[in-house]
Amino acid sequence: MSLRAKTCPQRREMASATSGPGRCVSKGGLGRRPPLARVRVAVRLRPFMDGETEAKELPCVRAIDSCSLEVANWKKYQETLKYQFDAFYGEKSTQQEVYVGSVQPILRHLLEGQNASVLAYGPTGAGKTHTMLGSPEQPGVIPRALMDLLQLAREESAEGRPWDVSVAMSYLEIYQEKVLDLLDPASGDLVIREDCRGNILIPGLTQKPITSFSDFEQHFLPASRNRAVGATRLNQRSSRSHAVLLVKVDQRERLTPFRQREGKLYLIDLAGSEDNRRTGNQGIRLKESGAINTSLFVLGKVVDALNQGLPRIPYRDSKLTRLLQDSLGGSAHSILIANIAPERRFYQDTISALNFTARSKEVINRPFTNESLQPHALAPVKLSQKELLGPSEAKKAKGPEEESTGSPESTAAPASASQKLSLLQKLSNMDPAMLENLLSMERLLGSQGSQGTPLLNTPKRERMVLMKTVEEKNLEIERLKMKQKELEAKVLAQEAPDPREKENTPTILQPPASYSGTVAKPLKKAVVMPLQRIQKQRESSNQIQLLKKGPKRKLEPSPESEAVEKDEDYWEVQISPELLAHGRKKLLDLLNEGSARELRSLQRIGQKKAQLIVGWRELHGPFSEVEDLEQVEGISGKQVESFLKANLLSLAASQHSGPS
């Protein structure tokens, strides 16, 4: 069965309706805030299924105008319930009217890099699948939208136009909370993901490129036969799953700045809600009906949460709402077509569908343009081997004739040499592929009139001059370092103590360069200090000393042979007894008089131990010595020993460095 039969006149009519200024791609809006777009809703009333029912009873729905309808109130028969929507299509409306009035206007947003979605909603047997698919004589929304979209893509990709447009399709169904690929039924259950920008995607979903309507039919018709359908009391071909046709429109700009746009069109045929008491579902049909009703119930919860402005929207409660996250409250231009039946036996289903549709029109979406720049738009340019070599490698690669050659002009660096030096040093060790991209970008900027420094295009002789300047600066830095070391040696010689005073003062040994202790390293520049500060340092050296204890053997690996033993000096910090006694007294005073907060400032004392110390002190009085902490329940002797090591030196040093 072909979807194209008897549609050629309508196709020409739609193509002429979409041509003109209304189809132009929007040039602005990239830097502005995305405008708000309300979900547009339309209601379609199908005719009676047979003439006998139409002759026996009146319809429970009556049209008021092209946007309003009224339904009999089952509570009060003398009153009616009135509803107003964006569009209302009566039982005599055609597929062409529904498509042109509600669906066709949103197709232009796809060429602007925005998303759009069309949802068919309603109870079972209300005509949703007929609205979306139709028949060969009356094609529905899906074939009409694909014909127009492919026509727009061909016009936009014509020779001389700035954009190259491609179209691809995917087709899936949600059956019993499983996402199944209708183009590849053997792929199994797929997962729904969300990227860093909040876009919903399905990894592993088959994507088929299409260039004509024949390509679309070739993929779509066999895939439609894979959709789950079944017979119930109310519908002989009831859809047992939600079907989603995803059409992706990619646009690539042919000229600079080589922008790329991506628009997606979701065409969704929802399964209808069912009352199992009337459908007589049993077994697998009952299980399918439960999954359908659950997903539609979550869909209603999502709409209510969006209307109430709740902080959490339950998109993840079902696969359907997760997939529709972009269509409801997301970034898509959405159209909801609610299908209802005129028979009185469908009255409750009709009221439920109309109430859901009325709530859905309050949902606000925020469409935006999905636009990016192509990172690989520039053609790579290969560099020669000499251009990729750094300064040292270039010098080694030069022959003796090249080294000896030179001219007076080559010794003069350009005025902007200081700006090029650091950049050339970075470029010399850069990845070759990145260098190719940089060179391509530089040539592009040069063609646009850029005044940047052409580092990679500098002549060979000028680059040699710059490298020579870099080497001269490195030699000058080495000379400055040697001069600094000489100045440091002179300062240390002036500060050396008199040999006659050596017998009366303790020797202070400097640790070797390999010693990694807590002693601060000497400054590497000459500093003139006042006499009072030097005197304080000499007095402090009598309190804390770093003594050499003797050689200590250490095994070190050798590159030529096995491990070799090496003697290293062993150092030990020695503190004067007076300073230790003062620190111990200060620590004991803090244990006896400090509050719990002050005790927590000590090392190895937390909230629990501080409370234990305060409680023990209240029961037994003050501590006579610091070692009495062992008597506190929960504090062992090892903990007291580590407590002393952690706090004695810091308290003594703080007291010693404080004001006298």
Swiss-Prot record:
Q: Which stretches are tagged as biased composition: Low complexity?
A: 405-418
How does the record describe the protein's post-translational processing?
Ubiquitinated; mediated by SIAH1 and leading to its subsequent proteasomal degradation.
* Name of the protein in question: Kinesin-like protein KIF22
Q: What Gene3D superfamilies does UniProt report for this protein, alphabetically? A: AF1531-like domain, Kinesin motor domain
Which amino acid positions bind ATP, per UniProt?
A: 122-129
Cross-link Glycyl lysine isopeptide (Lys-Gly) (interchain with G-Cter in SUMO2), where in sequence = 460
**Positions with biased composition (Polar residues):** 505-516
Cellular localization per UniProt: Nucleus; Cytoplasm, Cytoskeleton
Q: Which UniProt keywords are listed?
A: ATP-binding, Coiled coil, Cytoplasm, Cytoskeleton, DNA-binding, Isopeptide bond, Microtubule, Motor protein, Nucleotide-binding, Nucleus, Phosphoprotein, Ubl conjugation
Concerning its family, UniProt says: Belongs to the TRAFAC class myosin-kinesin ATPase superfamily. Kinesin family.
Give positions of region: Disordered: 1-31, 391-418, 493-516, 534-567
> Can you supply a Gene Ontology BP term from the record?
sister chromatid cohesion
Q: Give the quaternary structure.
A: Interacts with FAM83D and SIAH1.
Q: Which SUPFAM superfamilies match?
A: P-loop containing nucleoside triphosphate hydrolases (SSF52540), RuvA domain 2-like (SSF47781)
Briefly, what is this protein's role? Answer: Kinesin family member that is involved in spindle formation and the movements of chromosomes during mitosis and meiosis. Binds to microtubules and to DNA. Plays a role in congression of laterally attached chromosomes in NDC80-depleted cells.
Coiled coil region boundaries:
460-505
- Gene Ontology CC annotations of this record: chromatin; cytosol; microtubule; mitotic spindle; nuclear speck; spindle
Q: Source species, please?
A: Mus musculus
Which GO molecular function, any one, fits this protein according to its record? Answer: microtubule binding
* Gene name, Swiss-Prot/TrEMBL: Kif22
